[in-house]
Structure formats: C-alpha cells, structure tokens
Amino acid sequence: MKLSLSVALSLAAATAQAATQFCDQWGSVTEGNYILYNNLWGQAQATSGSQCTTFESLSGNTIVWNTKWSWSGGQGQVKSFANAALQFTPKKLSSVKSIDSTWKWNYSGSNIVADVAYDMFLSTSPGGDHNYEIMVWLGALGGAGPISSTGSPIATPTVAGIKFNLYLGPNGSMQVYSFVAQSTTNSFSGDMRDFFTYLESNQGLSSDLYLVDVQAGTEPFSGSNAVFTVSDYSVSVA
C-alpha cells in the first residue's frame, strides 16, 4: 500500500512522539532542548526500591513527562533526581536577561517524602566545577528538608510572587542556596532570573559567575507507589 508524503510525515512525527520509558540507573533520553534523566544517584542508600521515568511528549519547548517510584530505607537520604535538564550555552549571570519558565506538576502515592525543585548550578568558568547550587523548591512533601548549616532559614523573601524560606549550607565544595516555598506550588510561571537577582542584591552573589545548568525534577526520600506527573514544563535562557 502506498502512502502519501503527508501521511508518511504524520506517521513519522507520531513515532517520534511515542512514549519512552527507562528504568536503568543512568537512563536518559534527549528530546528537543531537553535531556530527561532517571538519575538514581542515591539508590544505594535504599534497602529496597525502584524507579522508572517516562518521556510522554514535546510540543514546541514544552515537555510532558512522569516518573514512578517506590523507595524504602535510608531515612533522610535522597534516592534519585529524575529531571528535565535544559541544553544551552553557559552564560555569565551579568548577560542573562531572563530564565522564563512554566511548570505544572502533581504527586500521588503513599507516605511520600520528596521535594519538587528547580536545580541550577553556577561556576567561575563555562566548563569548570560547580561552585554554587541554587535550588527552588516548589514542594516539600512529607517533611522533606533542604541542605542547611543551621536548620533555620536565613531569610524569608518573596520572589516571583511566592513566599519562600531561604536556606544556606554546603554540598561538598559547593554552597547551596535553597528557596523553599512556604506553601506547595503545583503551578508556576515566572522568571527564574529573579532568584539570582535576589541573591546578588541580598547575599553578595557575583554576577561574574556562569550559569551552567538548569534542571527541574523531583528528589524522593521514601514512599511507595509514587507517581510524579509533569503535565507542562518549559524553560529558556535568554
């Protein structure tokens, strides 16, 4: 049977958009400007568990995906960070005009302890080691808490119209700033550049640092039959 060119192209497009699931520790798939990772970097801390991540679709710059997991043991230890990482050329903060993003997500499952967060990294050079980690937690579920030297926030800023508790602590050689939303935010639309602007103005962060990574996903600590669904995610660096 012969197919017209338009039908053939439509079938090819449908094939390209077919759901892709991966369950291996370092599994990933590249779609558009994103690399979607399973990233089970802390699975050795669990006494049992597993996780699979699925790419569902990409429309323009908007990616739809989910991850399903069950983890037990290793209380207080992160087991993974399934995330969508943006591919872009590192830029000095002084040259970054905007980091526009939208994110709609949902969680279901039993006894979930997890965070839902943007994870962004800064370096003194485009290809150098990470010096700063900037996290923006839209959800801190089941008592999940950020890295902190004191266990108490150093400030309570309002950024992008959301009230946060800001924490500071070390992660190896990096300094980690964690903005933790005071109320779970399942739908976000804003400019992530605002968080860096706040740190430059209030915490002495240098604008000479390079923005080298922008990721968004979930860090599970423990729970069962968890389903983290991202129905709308996009981000761009300009």
Swiss-Prot record:
InterPro entries: ConA-like_dom_sf, GH11/12, GH12. GO terms for biological process: cell wall organization; polysaccharide catabolic process. Its EC number is 3.2.1.151. It is an enzyme of class 3 (hydrolase). GO terms for cellular component: extracellular region. It comes from the Eukaryota. Keywords: Carbohydrate metabolism, Cell wall biogenesis/degradation, Glycoprotein, Glycosidase, Hydrolase, Polysaccharide degradation, Secreted, Signal. Catalyzes endohydrolysis of 1,4-beta-D-glucosidic linkages in xyloglucan with retention of the beta-configuration of the glycosyl residues. Specific for xyloglucan and does not hydrolyze other cell wall components. This is Probable xyloglucan-specific endo-beta-1,4-glucanase A.
